């Protein structure tokens, strides 16, 4: 943990998750421990940290073992004394699909929030690359803003990033930090990743912590990487350019509040 009460250290974990649940959990735990040893206060994992490029049976098996995922995150949050935003992991849905769910834990290991991804990636990136998340993921219907360490986090996942109204809603609910665990494709990442993340930071005067998946997953899908930590002015404080790893940034916990007072654009909107 950082020494000053005015300072916090954010950490974003970049992973190359596979279709093997236990390997991914071991990898995530190692990165959280690495971040904790470096003094991190808030650690954010990427989307699909526990399972990536899985078959239907593998997804269902992982969802049925979600208690193992939750137990690991709770234990390492308590052991390391860090807040964990748990990227996303599959949980069982009532209709036989799974949810793409982010679980949030405080320093004591208590689960303080659950967010199910609302916007599902049903797109054709190219003639050769298309996705239909709604065929196996049930969408959530409730945004989540959760307060811990005296700060409010707005929890989002990947494709949510393209819907600015969600971030404005979370900002109006008090969020000063947006977490955006992601698994962007390489083409969309090259074209839009940095632009979208900086825009969400600037237009809401909020921190953005955006951990990402990177590389080729189980010989199938390829993801962009480039995990980022961005300040409320849109400046990139840290970026992970390579493979799996951890980035950290020390920040002034009151910076977003100070900037919102000095540059009160959020109070100037005309359309409701």
Kindly give the residue locations of the regions a language model identified.
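Short, basic/aromatic-enriched C-terminal tail that caps enzymatic domains
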Residues: 248-250, 254-272
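Cys-nucleophile CN-hydrolase/nitrilase-fold catalytic domain and related Cys-dependent amidase chemistry
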Residues: 21-22, 29-108, 114, 185-206
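CN hydrolase (nitrilase-like) catalytic-core segments centered on the catalytic cysteine
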Residues: 65-85, 152, 158-247
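Active-site catalytic loop in hydrolytic enzyme cores
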Residues: 93-173, 186-195, 258-265
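Short polar catalytic/cofactor-binding loops
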Residues: 14-19
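Beta-strand-turn-beta hairpins that frame and shape the catalytic cleft
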Residues: 2-10, 145-154, 177
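Short beta-strand scaffold segments in enzyme catalytic cores
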Residues: 86-87, 101-104, 144-146, 227-229, ...
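Short, acidic/polar
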Residues: 23-32, 162-168
């Amino acid at each position: 943990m950082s020494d000053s009460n005015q300072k916090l250290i954010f950490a974003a974990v970049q992973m190359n998750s596979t279709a093997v649940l236990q390997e991914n959990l071991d990898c995530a735990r190692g990165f959280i421990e690495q971040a904790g040893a470096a003094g991190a206060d808030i650690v954010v994992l990427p989307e699909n940290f526990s399972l990536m490029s899985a078959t239907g049976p593998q997804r269902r098996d992982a969802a049925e073992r979600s208690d193992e995922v939750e137990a690991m995150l709770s234990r390492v949050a308590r052991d390391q004394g860090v807040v964990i935003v748990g990227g996303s992991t599959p949980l069982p849905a009532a209709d036989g699909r799974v949810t793409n769910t982010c679980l949030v834990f405080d320093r004591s290991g208590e689960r303080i929030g659950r967010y199910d991804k609302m916007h599902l990636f049903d797109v054709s990136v190219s003639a050769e690359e298309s996705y239909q998340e709604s065929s196996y993921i049930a969408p959530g219907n409730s945004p989540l803003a959760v307060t811990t360490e005296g700060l409010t986090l707005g929890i989002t996942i990947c494709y949510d990033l393209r819907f600015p109204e969600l971030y404005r809603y979370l900002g109006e609910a008090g969020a000063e930090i947006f977490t955006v665990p992601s698994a962007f494709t390489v083409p969309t990442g090259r074209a839009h990743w940095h632009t979208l993340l900086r825009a969400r930071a600037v237009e809401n005067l909020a921190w953005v912590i955006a951990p990402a998946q990177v590389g080729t997953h189980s010989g199938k899908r390829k993801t962009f990487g480039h995990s980022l930590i961005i300040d409320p002015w849109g400046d990139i404080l840290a970026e992970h350019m390579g493979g799996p790893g951890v980035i950290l940034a020390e920040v002034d916990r009151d910076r977003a509040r100070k900037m919102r007072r000095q540059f009160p654009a959020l109070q100037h909107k005309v359309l409701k």
